[in-house]
Amino acid sequence: MRASMLRLIRSRSSSAAPRPHLLRRAYGSESVPERKVAVLGAAGGIGQPLALLMKLNPLVSQLALYDIAGTPGVAADVGHINTRSEVAGYVGEEQLGQALEGSDVVIIPAGVPRKPGMTRDDLFNINAGIVKSLCTAIAKYCPNAVVNMISNPVNSTVPIAAEIFKKAGTYNEKKLLGVTTLDVVRAKTFYAGKAKVPVEEVNVPVVGGHAGITILPLFSQAVPKANLADEDIKALTKRTQDGGTEVVEAKAGKGSATLSMAYAGALFADACLKGLNGVPDVVECSFVQSSIITELPFFASKVKLGKNGVEEVLELGPMSDYEKQGLEILIPELKASIEKGIKFANQ
C-alpha cells in the first residue's frame, strides 16, 4: 500500500515533472538533500491527511507538525510510519518558533473550513487573522522558506502574507505561492471523464484565482485534445469553479474538500521540493505575484519551480473566445479580493 501511494503522488505531478527514475538519476537516494517541511494546522481536516502524505514523501527528512491543539497525537500516529522523515509535533504559540526553525517549505492549511451558509466574509474574518499571525512567525523564524498557502480565501491570504513579509523586511515574491492545485486536479478529473481519456494522461492549466468565477480552466489547452462541444466546455468550467461547493453539499454540512485538498497540497509541496533540489522542468499552476495582468498584482498561472522557488511565471498562451471572456469577468472580482487582503494586513 505504501509503495502504491508513493507512486500515486509522483505520477500525478505536472506532466513536466520528472518521473521517479529521472529523480534517481539526478541524485542517488543516499545523496537526497535534507529538507525540513513544516505543516501549520496539522491537526485539522486538511492537515492530518496532508501530514500523512508528506510522511510518505521520500524528499522530506524532517516533518514538523504544528497546531493550537492535537498535534502530539497526530505526530505520534504518523511518526510510526516507516519512511525516511523524522516527525515532531508542536502545540501552542510558544512552540511555533521551534516548528518553523530551519524549514525549507512551510505549508499552511490552518484555519476554519467552509460550511453551508458561510459567507466569504465570514471565512475571511477568521482565517485572515490566523494567516497574519502565522506569517509574522515565519518572517521571524524561517524567512527564507518557500511558503505554500492553502488557507482560504487564497485570493486574499496570499496578499496578506506578502504584506506581513514586506513589513518584516523578508518578502521574496519567488517564495510565496498560493496553492491552486486542487482546481487543476478537478479540471483534469472532470475533463478526462467527459473526453473519455485516461486521467493520468490529462493536463489542463487553470489560471486566475482560487474561488468561484476567478477559477479559469483553459480547456482549449487541454492535453490530450478532445473535440468537446461548447456546452460541454461551459459545463466543465462551471463544475471546476463550483467543485468546493459540490463537496460541501455532498457532505451535508459535516465537512469540506479536505481529502482532495490534502492530496493537491501534497502534490504541490512535492513539486516545490523537487524544484529546490534542482530537478529540471518542474511546472505547476500557482497563485503568485505576477505582471501577466496589469491590474492584478497576484495571479494564478503556470510557473516554473526551481532552487529559488518561482524561477519563471509563464505566459497564458492561446485562449479561446470563451476563456478570454471569462478572464475579463474575473478581473474585477479577483482585484477586489486582493485589495481586501492588502487592506486587512495594513490595519
Swiss-Prot record:
Residues reported to bind NAD(+): G41, A42, A43, G44, G45, I46, G47, D67, N127, I150, S151, N152, M261
Localization, per the record, is: Mitochondrion matrix
State where it is primarily located: mitochondrion
InterPro entries assigned: L-lactate/malate_DH (IPR001557), Lactate/malate_DH_C (IPR022383), Lactate/malate_DH_N (IPR001236), Lactate_DH/Glyco_Ohase_4_C (IPR015955), Malate_DH_AS (IPR001252), Malate_DH_type1 (IPR010097), NAD(P)-bd_dom_sf (IPR036291)
Tell me the enzyme class: oxidoreductase
Q: Where is the transit peptide?
A: 1-27
Question: Quick one: a GO biological-process term for this protein?
Answer: tricarboxylic acid cycle
In terms of superkingdom, the source organism counts as Eukaryota
Sorted keywords for this record are: Mitochondrion, NAD, Oxidoreductase, Transit peptide, Tricarboxylic acid cycle
Record GO cellular component, one term: mitochondrial matrix
Catalytic residues identified in the record: H210
Catalysed reactions, as listed in the record: (S)-malate + NAD(+) = oxaloacetate + NADH + H(+)
Q: Which residues bind substrate?
A: R114, R120, N152, R186
Instruction: Cite the CDD domains for this sequence.
Output: MDH_glyoxysomal_mitochondrial
Q: Which NCBIfam families match?
A: MDH_euk_gproteo
> What family is this protein classified in?
Belongs to the LDH/MDH superfamily. MDH type 1 family.
Assembly, in brief, is: Homodimer.
Q: What is this protein called?
A: Malate dehydrogenase, mitochondrial
Q: Which organism is this entry from?
A: Eucalyptus gunnii (Cider gum)
